[in-house]
Amino acid sequence: MPKKTRRNLLMAAGALLATALFVPVVSSGASAETAAVVTPASAAQPNIVGGNEAKLADYPYAVYLTDLDGNQFCGAVIISRTAVATAAHCALSMPRTKMHVVAGRQDKRSGGGVDTSVSRTWVQPDYTDPGQGDDIAVLTVRGILPYQPAKIAGQSDSELYSPGTKATVLGWGRIADGGARSDYLRSAVVPLVTDRSCTTSYGNYDPKKMVCAGYESGGTDACQGDSGGPLVVGDTLIGIVSWGEGCAKAGKPGVYTRVSAYADDLTREMSARILG
């Protein structure tokens, strides 16, 4: 079964095409409009399965991305008052001018919070597809995000990545593999998995660029629509939802971008500011 990223595929007109088993990975130089529907063997996509509704007051840095019609397709996380981090495959899924960041909105159907456009996009230069790692990007927004940013895990925070550490994944994605998307922010607690175990699950797993989290028996995971969202320990960002095989499958943990490997990049990019 092909692995998949955890982003919802949108047609240029905004119609949803994504299914639980086949979702696109936008490769280098490709757009969401031209990407193939079946993902390459190296990569896979997530919503919170097995979790619960969460209060945005507890996770004010959790945000999501939409197209111009308001269709949510990925998650993201506030890292400064003017920038959010997300997955590279989310940032590349459509032109910057057609992408919005929605913050401070627990229920997607409400009109609260801040809805802002993107003025600048930075994608990790080595990114080619989620299964190869480097699946991280920073979006600089127009205006100010008046919410608490997440802390960024650094190279010295290795203890946060200890196997068994309980982390929280957040998102508005599907609540079952192939099921309905959530209107509300959801959270789930998942333990970090050993690198050895994750390598057994996924032959292309790279412990320098990725981290795995999930239960051996499955049941709790990110899913389609959660890509780009945060994996946190306390209020420290340690991972970005990237890929996996199915959602909440036994022996197939979720794979996240290892934030500490890109801390310097994030620190540099979150201070970039383009007005207008």
Model-identified regions with their sequence ranges:
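Structural recognition of the beta-strand scaffold that forms the well-ordered cores
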Residues: A62-L65, V84-A85, H100, A137-V138, ...
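Extracellular collagen-like Gly-X-Y triple-helix signature, i.e., selective recognition
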Residues: G244-G276
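Catalytic nucleophile loop of clan PA
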Residues: V77-I78, L160-S162, G219-V241
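Chymotrypsin/trypsin-fold serine protease catalytic domain
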Residues: D107-G111, D115-T121, G133-G218, V259-D264
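Structural detector of coil-to-beta-strand junctions
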Residues: P60-A62, G75-A76, P149, V211, ...
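Protease-domain processing segments flanking chymotrypsin-fold serine proteases, especially trypsin-like
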Residues: P2-A85, S93-M94, K98-R105, T121, ...
